[in-house]
Amino acid sequence: MDYSGNKAAMGQDRPISETESMVKMNLSKDGKTLDLTATYLKEYGAKDISQMESLRPLTNLAFGTNLCGPKGVKWLAQSKVLVNLTSLNMFYNKMGNEGVKYIAVSDNLLSLQNLVLTDNEITDEGAITLAKFLPLFTNLVRLDLRLNRIKDDGKNALKEAQKIAAVKHLLLDKVEGFQVKS
């Protein structure tokens, strides 16, 4: 059954006061780190976050497992408030290729040094789009795209883009980043 048009499924039935309360509980004392992992804020929670002026100093946003979808990603990527982010963790948000495109073309996320897009149903199409814009992310050092559906075409496009971009750590395969040397 498709619940995509359901207000509750998109988080539209949640009052902004509830989102504000979650932000206050999970915001660091210095106001620079916000961990909203697994709070299931969904699309409208992402919209609320993207418009909170109090989050302008934020440099680190952990927004994994919120199931915000591509429209929620669009709110965050186009936010005029979240322009100081250096780290954005968006694992498991069901963004797909549409969502990754919003990140790729965002002028507001160019300060990112770390971007985690793990487990988001991204395919070659999204990877190739991201690869085209990767050189514009001059501060990006680490890009994590593990556990997606990226095949050789997408991986090769990203590896080629990495050669002219600042990205030092490009994680594409599920075993990368977990290797322990004895």
Question: Model regions: which residues?
Answer:
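LRR N-terminal entry segment and analogous cap-like coil->beta motifs
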Residues: 2-73
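Short loop/beta submotifs within extracellular cysteine-rich repeat domains
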Residues: 6, 42, 56-58, 69, ...
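Short, solvent-exposed loop/turn at the beta-strand->alpha-helix junction
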Residues: 13-19, 39-47, 67-74, 94-101, ...
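Leucine-rich repeat
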Residues: 20-29, 47-56, 75-83, 102-110, ...
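Hydrophobic beta-strand residues in large extracellular and virion-surface proteins
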Residues: 34-36, 49, 61, 76, ...
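Conserved hydrophobic beta-strand positions in leucine-rich repeat
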Residues: 34-36, 58-63, 85-90, 112-117, ...
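Alpha-helical adaptor scaffolds
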Residues: 64-81, 87-111, 116
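Leucine-rich solenoid repeat scaffolds
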Residues: 137-182
